[in-house]
Amino acid sequence: MSSRPLTIGLVAGETSGDILGAGLIRSLKEKVPDARFVGVAGPRMQAEGCEAWYEMEELAVMGIVEVLGRLPRLLKIRRDLTQRFSELQPDVFVGIDAPDFNITLEGNLKQRGINTIHYVSPSVWAWRQKRVFKIGKATNLVLAFLPFEKAFYDRFNVPCRFIGHTMADAMPLHPDKQAARATLGIAPEAHCLALLPGSRNAEVEMLSADFLKTAVLLREHFPDLEIVVPLVNSKRREQFEQIKSSVAPDLRVHLLDGQAREAMIASDAALLASGTAALECMLAKCPMVVGYRMKPFTFWLAQRLVKTQWVSLPNLLAGRELVTELLQTDCTPDKLAAALLPLFADSDKTAALRTTFVDLHQQIRCNADEQAAQAVLELVKPR
């Protein structure tokens, strides 16, 4: 029997992965207090005791130009990690998200006899589905947030475990709408709309004008309408303000630094870009409309690559259209406003929608950190 402590290799490539990694380490330490954690870690993972061979910022690059500029460094780091983990022989290696970096690394380590886990499934079920074969070769197990992801991997006999979603664990089943309104300074009885035009430069550029024009149309129906716009950082805020000054200079809005979750909980309805925001909005029990537009060629390409009937996670989870999706040429102020209007009514339909949101929340609320830790320990080879 080896006297070496349980050793887990970890690589996180961005802030979301750092949060997941920290939760995983916490849960593992509860079960194995003397375990050692080592690899590429952000500040949260390091605060939980993970030894960082490299800082996470080294991997956190976005955009083709930036990636190309950093490629020699990224390849060097991956070669070095392959060598160091091969020498260390951790009991299990966990690559957290960052699939372009981690899946190749996982494959290298699996070939060297190390059990590997990929934590957070890439969207292989939606596009570039053939990646599933590479993932199957590179990993012993995929940890998936959503049940339809596991169903996809099962079709290809790739080991996958559905662990639930950490966001579903973090959010209450029945959020306090009035408390959120008090936090944001929204009147208790006012109609309230959240606008979330995305977190990326291109999204804010493509969507903000039509989202603002939609809000102007809704204000005509609801003179007391409060409009809250959470923006992820100062760059997006500045970009949004510039667009607003030319499109709707007289429209009164509450610009928020972050606070997307509070904005969703406080609102009667939300208009948002697709992505994780739609899942968060569902967990906030806020009825929504998804509006999205891309450059024409990008949309043409996406239509040929994307294999799913819907783009928003609430619809994918439900297996039916719960949430109206207005994409590309359908993403117009008139159509967006027409889809949003009924959501402000306290009707049986909106009540049923919120009940369905609660049911879906319960489906993916499984204590993901604990489930992930259990999956890691089950892959540890007997010594």
From Swiss-Prot:
EC class name: transferase
GO molecular function, one term: lipid-A-disaccharide synthase activity
EC identifiers of the protein: 2.4.1.182
Disulfide partners: none
CDD domains hit by this protein: Glycosyltransferase_GTB-type
Pathway: Glycolipid biosynthesis; lipid IV(A) biosynthesis; lipid IV(A) from (3R)-3-hydroxytetradecanoyl-[acyl-carrier-protein] and UDP-N-acetyl-alpha-D-glucosamine: step 5/6
NCBIfam families registered for this protein in UniProt: lpxB
HAMAP family: LpxB
Family: Belongs to the LpxB family.
Functional description taken from the UniProt entry: Condensation of UDP-2,3-diacylglucosamine and 2,3-diacylglucosamine-1-phosphate to form lipid A disaccharide, a precursor of lipid A, a phosphorylated glycolipid that anchors the lipopolysaccharide to the outer membrane of the cell.
UniProt-recorded name of the protein: Lipid-A-disaccharide synthase
Organism per entry: Pectobacterium carotovorum subsp. carotovorum (strain PC1)
